Amino acid sequence: MRVSQSLIPFAIIALVLSFVNAYDPSPLQDFCVAIDDLKGVFVNGRFCKDPERVDAKDFFFSGLNVPGNTNNQVGSNVTTVNVDQIPGLNTMGISLVRIDYAPHGQNPPHTHPRGSEILVLVEGTLYVGFVSSNQDNNRLFAKVLHPGDVFVFPIGMIHFQLNIGKIPAIAFAGLSSQNAGVITIANTVFGSNPPIYPELLARAFQLDANVVKELQAKFGSI
């Protein structure tokens, strides 16, 4: 499905805004292109490529125009562009993703432990939101987004997106880290390795222990 050209500026603006207050430490040199050479200089968790050997391909990625495969259990696909895809992002404190959603597909509740997120919807209709911390009484902040709408997910907050439309949806998001990380709640709690004691989860979630074991089996923990 072709993305409307009129919405591209919205996506660009949203991503630029995410650059303004990057979460990662600021660089002290022009760039530090990540490399797996153990003889390099170690900066921000990665080794730096010799600046004399850096070229344009170290700052380039191609493929965000390609829809992700949403034929899976949650009906969504995240195409990530972080320091692993563009080594020149090392120390820059930014990254981005493309998210494709099948009709009624979702990006299930998850957190990014190292970065905030700003999302712009390009196509479709999404129900999105995040839940604040215990200190803030776990308030839900949610909106229905239409093409051109933007929503922010604060760092560390559990958040989600659900395609409530009858057609596929497409969104782009900027993150304030070169590698914001992701913790999907259900996979983490019920799919940990080794598994968390079922009795603990049963009491925490007010469930029968057998139900917990079924969930752990579903998510691959046992």
From Swiss-Prot:
Provide the residue positions that the database annotates as binding Mn(2+).
Answer: H110, H112, E117, H159
Its family? Answer: Belongs to the germin family.
Annotated Gene Ontology MF terms? manganese ion binding
Establish whether keyword Secreted is in the entry. Answer: yes
Arranged from A to Z, the UniProt key words for this protein are: Apoplast, Disulfide bond, Glycoprotein, Manganese, Metal-binding, Secreted, Signal
Output the SMART domains linked to this UniProt entry.
Cupin_1
Segments forming domain Cupin type-1: 62-213
Q: Which GO terms describe its cellular component?
A: apoplast
Record protein name field = Germin-like protein subfamily 1 member 16
InterPro entries recorded: Cupin_1, Germin, Germin_Mn-BS, RmlC-like_jellyroll, RmlC_Cupin_sf
Q: Does the keyword Secreted apply?
A: yes
Predominant location of this chain? secreted
The upper taxonomy is:
Eukaryota, Viridiplantae, Streptophyta, Embryophyta, Tracheophyta
* Residues bearing attached sugar chains per UniProt: N77
Cystine residue pairs: C32-C48
Q: How does it assemble?
A: Oligomer (believed to be a pentamer but probably hexamer).
Instruction: Tell me the compartments it is located in.
Output: Secreted, Extracellular space, Apoplast
Looking at the UniProt entry, the stretches that span the membrane are none
